[in-house]
Amino acid sequence: LRPDLRYATGNVIFKVSGTVIMSQPPVCIAALYRFTPFADPAALRASLLEACLQHGIRGTLLLAREGINGTIAGSAEGIESILAHIRSLPGCDALEWKLSWDDAMPFNRMKVRLKREIVTMGQPDIDPLAGVGRYVPAAEWNALISDPDTILIDTRNDYEVAVGTFKGAIDPDIQSFREFPDWFRARRAALEAEGRKPKIAMFCTGGIRCEKSTAFALSEGVEDVYHLKGGILKYLEDVPEAESLWEGECFVFDQRVTVRHGLEPGAYDLCHACRRPVSAQDKTSPLFIDGIQCPACAAERTDEQRARYAARQHQEDLARARGTHHIGGDA
């Protein structure tokens, strides 16, 4: 957003120098992060939460000594105000953010949480401010990953990769970003055994995980490291579907669940037991029970957990029938 934008009610009408340039649905969603040293992140929490509540913003923001990360949603005016507030924080003038739009609010409440890391890798010596891989804009990404000398790595979790990834990408098959360093070390050892020193290109949803994964690769002595600037979301926003090398949809951590090219809402729902994406085919499985379990987590749940999920689902169904929202929702 820019200071000279103007808004109308309903669909948001953007004007720059009096010229209408686009219209969007009424809910603006901002995915943002910035690595910067905060001496006392706890001191920033109260004013940030107050500003978000004042502007009707919902979502989650994480604060740590290494910076800020999160996804928030609200009116375009409200998001513009909060982005300005965050950019006024120490070292946040170069805040990275991406906008998308929806007809419905994808979050139930506003949370500002204090964390050890804004994205958890479990490698305290890795500092993206000390050096990361080379950023590759979305417009140049296809050429890089089409090069046979490039090894393409998806740094996301297994359930994210399952709904979509780039053609030819390696899936580390990890359940947590904490597992990535060990996987990478093993993969690098295998490449060295083959006598290969390829270019390594990495990608993730919005770019933040690659700040750490490429910094980690550099710390391991890998020299030719690249990552997709703005992540998958920027690629899906900027690259026409006819030219795209992306296959499937992109998982996002809010009630939209997935998005497609143009950042249009995808076709997946969310399992409220395990928080994994659920496809239309998954719902035909006898293991799927709405709000209680899906095929991916059916074997992981106890009868006590299922009973608790069933009670929660009953409350949500009652709230929906009344036309209200059940405050016990997770997002």
Predicted regions located by residue number:
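Short, well-ordered loop/turn elements at secondary-structure boundaries
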Residues: 146-148, 196-197
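Short hydrophobic beta-strand that contains or immediately precedes a catalytic carboxylate
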Residues: 151-155
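Rhodanese-like catalytic fold shared by cysteine-dependent sulfurtransferases
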Residues: 23-132, 156-201, 208-331
